Amino acid sequence: MRKGELQQVDAPQVLYDRPDNLFVAGFIGSPAMNLLEGKLERDGNGLVAVAGGLRLALDRELVGARPALASFVGTPLIIGIRPESIDDAAIAGDDPRRQLRGEVLLRESLGSEVMVHLSVDARQAVTDEVRELAQDIGGEAPGSADQRAIVVGRFNARSRVQTAQTARAVVDTRSLHFFDPQTGLGIYDAEATDSKELDPS
């Protein structure tokens, strides 16, 4: 519900896996989805998500399931990464094509997992939807897009990363999300995306 209007009605798992827009994406899940300014680039036969100094090779199955992504190559979009898709590279696998580096600002050991807050070389997405969502869930409104983004990851409980260190994390690119920064809509099927752009309501 946003400003009295239903945003999406579906099973909880569908809302989590395939949110219609930025508002739903950020509302479902805790901690909230990380949202970064970015773009897509072609790399050989594949696609790479680029956000500042971060480069993440996209899983081919993901690209095949979301044909609308092809029309966004080279244009701005918003990249969504859920915290549970980010893990300690020393434990989950050190794949340089899916890696991000950042300074550890905060480490929260929760027993079954470690919540790690990383300052990364990217810009946090700042839109009206993102600001409104932060207010609704009682969080801090995002700062300037010129600031380094803070990304939250759910690390394995055995992770040894410590505050003030530079940590390497690996991203499960099979579960990335993408949004049109102009409409806030999720980028999925070509036909669905076209119809939503013509009629945002």
Please describe what each predicted stretch is.
Residues 3, 37, 176:
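Conserved coupling/switch loops of ABC nucleotide-binding domains, chiefly the family-specific signature
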Residues 17-43:
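C-terminal boundary and immediately downstream tail of ABC-type ATPase nucleotide-binding domains
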Residues 3-4, 27, 49:
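Extended alpha-helical regions
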Residues 1-11, 18:
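ABC ATPase "signature
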Residues 13-16, 25, 87, 177:
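Generic structural signal for individual residues within well-ordered alpha-helical segments
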Residues 11, 23, 37-39, 101-104:
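Residues located in well-ordered beta-strands
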